[in-house]
Design a protein with these regions (language model features):
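Bacterial Sec-dependent signal peptides at the C-terminal "C-region" and cleavage site
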Residues: 12-26
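Sec-dependent signal peptide recognition
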Residues: 2-9
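Extended, low-polarity segments enriched in aliphatic/aromatic residues
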Residues: 24-77, 81-323
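Generic cytosolic/nucleocytoplasmic N-terminal low-complexity/intrinsically disordered segments
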Residues: 1-2, 19, 23, 57
Length: 323
């Protein structure tokens, strides 16, 4: 009888433990359909965080000629609410954002200098930060000014991407926070760490290796900010083109805007956004097929799978509508 009771108790505790584990690995993702300055602040406040110290707001300044990047009037209220600095890094390809001077000129033309200070984080060089997953990249090369910040708001424009399939918060803090050389290192999955030589291997790198390298780099930035305690994630799902904001001639969006989503878990957030896109039944005026094809053809969701595998976050989430 005692043995039976003991086994029963063990079973009960095992079930409780399993349930608790499930709860711990289910992230909350907050969502509003209100794509406005007010909606952005509202979804940010739903996270219940209070950033302290120097706050970096990581966005994409957008390539000249592009039109889908997050506009200053959308992000102004949030950036000023947290007394944030807009941060970016130079790109690895020749163009208007290749040098700091030209990049700042682009930021000015796009209106970002009118709402906040803009810091090109690799303007004075780069630093190396550690990565946990060394399958491909052995370290992460980021803009040296990253060290000047105590907190980061990863504010991404969710959309398609020519190489990654889609770009959300994982891409925004991997390729986005990497210096020019760091971008080359990620794109070549740890083979080349000099942007001038990147083109020798850019198109011969295994696609999954590139995606896995992005996941590893994203994790290193997450861990850099006190193991994720000092970083939050927001995806704005508007202007859902198949092309990235790094394109000077992006395709027009074929589907309707969806909303703004936020979470403390970048894996859950990107997973939720991808599922929202896939849930749209293609129809006239709201055709999700091109973006879905872009994601599938690049095996884009592999970055999410790998990010979960290496412990960056969880694909399990609870979607909380705050409207």
């Amino acid at each position: 009888m005692k043995k039976l009771l003991y086994l029963l108790l063990v079973a009960v505790f095992a079930i409780i433990s399993c349930c608790n584990t499930e709860q711990k690995h289910t992230a909350k993702v907050y969502m509003t359909k209100d794509i406005s300055a007010e909606g952005l602040v509202k979804v940010y406040e739903a996270l219940g965080v209070k950033p302290k110290g120097n706050v970096a707001v990581k966005i994409s300044t957008g390539e000249p000629g592009g039109r889908n990047f997050l506009k200053p009037e959308l992000i102004k209220e949030l950036v000023q609410k947290v007394n944030g600095t807009i941060v970016e890094c130079n790109v690895a390809y020749q163009g208007p954002r290749y040098t700091t001077e030209a990049h700042l000129q682009t930021a000015k033309e796009h209106g970002f200098l009118d709402i906040a200070d803009v810091d090109i984080m690799d303007a004075e060089g780069e630093i190396i930060i550690p990565v946990k997953d060394t399958t491909h990249i052995k370290y992460n090369i980021v803009g040296s000014h990253l060290a000047n910040y105590d907190y980061m708001i990863n504010l991404a424009h969710f959309k398609g991407h020519g190489m990654g399939g889609f770009g959300g918060v994982l891409k925004n803090q991997s390729i986005g926070v990497a210096s020019g050389n760091g971008k080359a290192y990620i794109h070549t999955a740890g083979v080349i760490d000099t942007k001038e030589k990147m083109w020798d291997r850019l198109f011969t790198t295994e696609q999954d290796h590139f995606l896995e390298s992005m996941a590893a780099a994203a994790q290193s930035v997450h861990d850099y900010f006190k193991n994720g305690d000092n970083i939050i994630y927001i995806n704005v799902m508007n202007n859902l083109s198949v092309d990235c904001d790094c394109s000077a001639h992006p395709a027009d969006p074929t589907m309707k805007d969806i909303g703004i989503l936020a979470s403390k878990d970048p894996v859950a957030l990107d997973q939720a956004c991808v599922e929202l896109v896939f849930a749209v039944v293609p129809e006239e005026g709201n055709d999700s097929a091109p973006l879905i094809e872009r994601i599938k053809s690049r095996h884009g969701t592999h970055i999410i799978d790998h990010a979960e595998k290496i412990g960056l976050g969880s694909k399990k989430y609870e979607l909380v509508n705050i409207d």
